[in-house]
């Protein structure tokens, strides 16, 4: 089988070689009769190639039997042909390339004409007496036998305005780097300003909370219905089980309806008149006292005691002083003192010396009873109030009411 395949391959290879030899012989036989400037026409005869005039050349090569379709065409740019003939157009001379001035431009029929050497260049003279076309630099020091080098002129090279791609890429990289740096600086500035703002924000928030809190404390005074009543200072002393010389909480007097009515019923903004005490029933008065001191004293004064600064009590005890606002009450700040208010009430009613003495004793009893329980303080204040009313009203009806109230007061406190 292998012997049969091998002769088949040899047969195909031999046939291909014979075909190539036949083609080569045929080509050589067809063109072998024509010379360099001849081509063979359709009849098989050798014909002379066309000749073109100045500035013209054949469109394709002609000779040795080829170039039957060649035609004369103008010379290509930067090429010229001065005479008739079979030759092709020649390239024009470049005067700048040989460091010479250009006197005439190149055309299809004439070559460019170059002049003298550029300043700083000279033409070498050959041994046969001819000079080279190319001008060479004079060098430093210049040759003394060349006149062009003695009048050397310093030339300044003008940079090209067209930037290269490399310069463009470099400029783009530099601009990108600058933009990145500026963006980073901007981000750092924003972060710094934000931190500064966050550091200063707590103090601002505390101020706003203080303003908000003060506004909430004064909200009860903004009610239109309070314009018809005169606000008085309401002073109430409260004794706690804290040690001596404890803090005193200053809170505003929240003159709401319930607190104001209860305060007027018992202590009020100052002491009430004897006529009012005579008109009230001792039993109802006894019932009102625990309710007032249990609800009003604990709820109002204890609720707002934390919102006001601490002040040391010189008498050695914890007292809750409910200050009123002068712009709302229209009274002097001295009215906050229970001694002054009690004295003023007694002086206005009768101006008696005994009433002043009772007021001083009342203030002394309050300061001395700091170690007693809360109900004891309430009873002491109530007894002082009744004593002052009794001194101002020596009438028989007033003494009877005072005795009835004194009898009803211990019973009410024991029930509480």
Swiss-Prot record:
Residue intervals annotated with topology Extracellular: 30-170
Entry GO terms, CC: extracellular region; plasma membrane
Keyword Transmembrane: yes
PROSITE patterns on file: TNFR_NGFR_1, TNFR_NGFR_2
Keyword terms: Cell membrane, Disulfide bond, Glycoprotein, Membrane, Receptor, Repeat, Secreted, Signal, Transmembrane, Transmembrane helix
Glycan attachment residues as annotated in the record: 105
Subunit text: Associates with TRAF1, TRAF2, TRAF3 and TRAF5. Interacts with LINGO1.
Disulfide bonds: 34-46, 49-62, 52-72, 75-89, 92-106, 95-114, 117-135, 138-149
BP GO terms, sorted: hair follicle development; positive regulation of canonical NF-kappaB signal transduction; positive regulation of JNK cascade
Tissue expression notes: Highly expressed in adult brain, and in embryos from day 11-17, but not earlier. Detected in embryonic brain and epithelium, and at lower levels in adult heart, lung and liver. In neonatal mice, mainly in hair follicles and neuron-like cells in the cerebellum, but not in the skin epidermis. Isoform 3 was found in embryonic day 17.5 skin but not in brain and liver.
InterPro entries (UniProt xref): TNFR/NGFR_Cys_rich_reg (IPR001368), TNFR_19 (IPR022342), TNFRSF19_N (IPR034047), TNR19/27/EDAR (IPR047526)
Residue stretches spanning the membrane: 171-191
Function as written in the Swiss-Prot or TrEMBL entry: Can mediate activation of c-Jun and NF-kappa-B. May promote caspase-independent cell death. Isoform 2 and isoform 3 may act as decoy receptors.
The protein, known as: Tumor necrosis factor receptor superfamily member 19
Per-repeat ranges for TNFR-Cys: 33-72, 74-114, 116-149
UniProt feature, compositional bias: Polar residues: 331-351, 360-370, 381-396
Organism (species): Mus musculus (Mouse)
Molecular functions (GO terms): signaling receptor activity
Residues spanning the signal sequence: 1-29
Region span, Disordered: 321-416
Cytoplasmic side: 192-416
